[in-house]
Every structure is written in structure tokens, then in C-alpha cells.
Amino acid sequence: MKKYDLSTNEISDNLRYLELLSKQYPTINEASTEIINLQAILNLPKGTEHFLTDIHGEYEPFIHVLKNASGVIKRKIEDLFGNSLMQSEKKSLATLIYYPEQKLEIVLKQEENIDDWYKINLYRLIEICRYVSSKYTRSKVRKALPKDFTYIIEELLHEQPKGIDKYEYYEQIIRTIIDTDRSKEFIVALSKLIQRLVIDRLHILGDIFDRGPGADIIMDTLVEYHSVDIQWGNHDILWMGAACGSDVCIANVIKNSLKYANLDTLENGYGINLLPLATFSMDFYKDHPCNIFLPKMDCDKKYSINEINLIAQMHKAIAIILFKLEGQVILRHPEFNMNHRLLLNKINYAEGTINLNGKTHKLKDSFFPTIDPKNPYELTYDEKELIDKLKTSFINSDKYNKHVRFLYSNGSLYLKFNSNLLYHGFIPLNEDGSFKKVKIADKEYKGKELLDKLDMLAREAYFSKDKDDSDNKKDIMWYLWCGASSPLFGKDRMTIFEQYFIEEKETHYEKKDPYFSLRDNEDICKKILKEFGLSSPESHIINGHMPVEEKNGESPIKANGTLLVIDGGFSKAYQPKTGLAGYTLIYNSFGLQLVSHQPFESTEAAIKEETDILSTTLLLEQVVNRKRVEDTDVGVTLKQQIDDLKMLLNAYRKGLIKQQNKI
């Protein structure tokens, strides 16, 4: 912080700003008091950050991990009641905190002496609440309190019932809560307050959407969350592109949903009408088996044989439309360097084969009633009409657009936060580790400049009013989804067509960007950090996107701890590969911890049987001196505010600004 005594010239240079600041702090006393308050905050322990990534619609385990704070709440219970409660009591108390409304329903049916139960658990919850709130200012805790119980909870948190008078006062408050039949509401309020206080900031490193059945539920949760940021993943950007009105992104979103038989998010979550697609697919593929388009049934929902066959027909119909639309985008943008993905013109439609790289492959399905071999990328009249109907449904969904606007307002391609660099995918590199140049329009970008440019273009695609250039702006969203140099994808190609239609596995290969072989090199990682203005020895890159195959010995800790990959397999589709069901990275005042999670059974089992996710915590880094608010980004801002207030004090004392004392 700056010196306390400043020259008249220094103050005069900032006089206009200080006059504005004096409106908020009109006297020496008020400015001094605020300096004292801010200085006190700087000395508090830093808040706890939680990092999660690649949730892929798996809303039940995601919400449970938020509720149990990746095992932190269980540890708090152990800290306080480790020697005074039985294991069964600790499990019940934890479940009450995670799911207070549902647990209370069960207790009310089973408990004979409910008033005693209320009293015991109110005392326990208050003790936990006092414990988890101790690192925050009263003001911050007050802002987190429910309005109905603000005064009472404040009294209970800050009273220490040791003296006789205080004990009686404390006990009378509890008794009155029970007597006025407000125990249930009070328990719910305390439980949710505990959940809120144990996670000060939530970071979501992308891929909220696709595969799992509840991306809309996850988004509802995030919209209401007290402090969250999002680093967009390629699956998120696809849904954002669909909201921009991009035909190719809309087709991709629907194709991905049908691939995993995940219609709930589209139809029930967002009210997207898929009936026109169902009608279209039955018209063109009614008597065609569409076997290679049968969905992957990872979801718990049961479908009849007829429903599965219809999903397969819809899947094929939208996939063919998608390949046409992708071809149109590639032809519009030679700078994307994606001509190798123009495949429909390489098919021999008479023989049912395709020639790739000089080799002819037999297609597993060669029934293409909507493709004109002479003009394979042109949509038929019916296909154009279908896409227009689907686009109208996407654009007019209020809830969907509310969620997309939240992704824009709370999200970005990358984030620098508390000396860490957060991004979902990767930074494009050359084989020698230098930053890869990527051409956008008529200019080349690399490193941080590339991500900044693409972030700006992603925002323009949704918010721009320029209708004449709207297609080009929307096309960048598709490139971010699957482009070879998109910092969200990371492979030279996305071989969706080959995986559908060609048996030979070598055609399915997708070469990864050099980043993924170089990210274990500490010098490379430090070079990336430096590119983004981070040079602290305590800085880390926190990364998602590529699942860590821990069961095969892969470590999430790269480059001597400089880079941490935290995609552990929230998505059920990846759990056989990872051997886990996700990671949470926790950064608190004591250091960094990586928590690995085993698969979550169900919310119902968590409530009725009091089962919890089995989590294992690995201590990555432990600091010698506990991290304080002054060591964080918030601390930098507070120090600047203190400097400004000290300058204001100087201005008052030198008579350059008059105090506004009330008479």
C-alpha cells in the first residue's frame, strides 16, 4: 500500500475522483472507520474455492457434491463431534444438512419425541454454523442469512452461552423457535447457510451440457448460486451457438442429444419442439432400420422398442442435415482450413463407398434419400423448412435463453483468479512449444491474444445487431466447437462421420494438439502462465476437457504440480475409462487439495439410506503461512480502496476537500 502522507500535488492530480469519493465518506471519521474495517478484512483467512469441470448433465452427483462441499461438511462434523457422536448420528446430521426438507419429512414420520429431536439438532447445527462462519466478517455472514431469521441467527452465532444469563437467553431462543412451530424452517435455513458458507467461490471449468439428462437443472442451480464463474467448454459453446441461431450448432445440439437418448433437456427442460423432426424422419426413414444410429442408452429413462427406433431415425435425419450444414460453413470459410472435412462429395453413392486419402471404404449405411450426389451439401426444401422450425423453437425458449445469457455474463474462455489460470480446453501450441498462430479473418492471433479475440467473437455472435454479417459471426461458434485450432477442442479433426459410417478404426483417429504432450513440461506451463501475466511460483493452470485415466495410472498432476487436470469423469460415459466419477479441486487458506469421487448411487439413496459419495482427498500443497484475504484478488482491490481512502484523509486534513459534517 502507498505511504500515508501524500504531497499536495499528488492529491491535486486525483481531486475530481476524491471529491466523488467524499460523497460516500463525507468526514474524516467515516473514512478512517472504513480503512479500519477494510484492513481487518485483509487479515481474515481467504475464502474456500471449489473447482469442478465436465459435469455433462449429471445433475444428481453435481448437486450432491455442492451440498456436501466435496466432503468438507463431513470433515467439519468430525472436527466438532468426532468424540461425542456415534457414526450413525454423524451420518444423520450430515444428511440433514445436505437435504434438510427431505430428511425432515422422514424424521417427522419416525420420531416420537420431535421437540427433543428439534432441540438437539438445532444446537448441533448452530455449533456447525458458528464454526464455518468464523472466517468471515459479520457483515458477510449477515448478507448470506435468510431475511426471516437474520436477527435470531446473528444472536445465536455470536452469543457464547457460557454465563448463566447468556445460557438462559440462548436456551429461551431455541425453546421459542420450537414452541412457535418454526423449527422446520429454521433447520432448513441453518442447513442452507452451512452449505453456502463452506464454499466461498465456485469455478465451473466448462462442459455443463450433453450426455447426461439434467443440464437445465444444473444451470438452474448455478443461476441461483451465490458466487460462481464459468470457463466455457466446447459443449457449452455449441449450445450458446444454437441460441445465436446458428443452424449448424442447432443440428449438432440435437444430434448429441439423440445420440444419448437425452430428450428431457431439450423437450422438458427447455420446451424445444422436436415433433417436426420426428415427422420428417418418419417420412424419409420409416422403413429403414437406422441401426448405426441407435442411441447409447446411458440414461436411466426407459424407452420402448418403437421409441428407440424413432430416436434412431431422428438421429440419422439430423446427422445428414448436420453434415450438409458443416460443409456449407467450411466452404464459406477457407481460413478455417477444414476442407479435409468435406466428405459428402467423396462418396460413391451408386456403390455405397467413400474414398479417403486414396483408400476406398465400404459405408455401413448407404441409404441417403435426401442427398443429391451432384450437390451433396444443399438442403432439400423439407430440410430447410425443418431447420427453420427448430431454430424458431430454440430462439423463442425463454428459459434456454436465460441460461445462455447467464453463461455469457458469468463465463469466459479463460479466467485469472487468485494467481491461477483457469480454462477448459488448451492453448494451441506448435510441436516446439511455441504458441501457434491462428488466422481469423485476415489477421493471425496466438496465445492470450487468440483467446481474447475468440471470446469477443463469441459475444458478438449472440449480442451483435449486425444482420448482414450474422452468418459469419455465428459460424465462429461452430469452429470453437470442433475447429483444429479452437482452444476448446484440441484435435486435428472431429471424425463423427467416420465413426458412424466406416468400420475401419484407423479412420476414426483424431490427432491431439501438441499441447497435450507438452503440458507435462514445467517450462511450457510456466511459459503459458507468463503469457497470461502470471509469474508467481504459486500460480497453477487448472484444466478440464480431457478425462484423466487414473485407473491406467495417469495422474491429474502435471508439470511438477504446475498444471492440474480435474476432469475425473462426472459423465457416466467416461467412468469406465477414468475409474472415477469426478474430481473437485479445493483451494482454501491452508493450500490445495484434490478430491476424487466414486460414483454416486442416487439422491434417493442419499436421503433414505444416508449414503454419501465416497471421496478421497489428496493434499497437493500446504502453505507455511495461512493465506489471508490480502493474498487474493479481492485483497488487491481492498488495498487499492484503502490507498484511495488514505488519499481522501490527506485531502481532508490539508483542507483540499471540505468535510460534510452534519449539524
From Swiss-Prot:
Transmembrane segments: none annotated. InterPro entries: FBPtase_class3 (IPR009164), Metallo-depent_PP-like (IPR029052). It holds the Pfam family FBPase_2. It catalyses: beta-D-fructose 1,6-bisphosphate + H2O = beta-D-fructose 6-phosphate + phosphate. Its EC number is 3.1.3.11. GO terms for biological process: gluconeogenesis. Its cofactor is Mn(2+). Pathway: Carbohydrate biosynthesis; gluconeogenesis. One of its GO terms (molecular function) is fructose 1,6-bisphosphate 1-phosphatase activity. Keywords: Carbohydrate metabolism, Hydrolase, Manganese. Belongs to the FBPase class 3 family. This is Fructose-1,6-bisphosphatase class 3 1. It comes from Clostridium beijerinckii (strain ATCC 51743 / NCIMB 8052). The gene is fbp1.
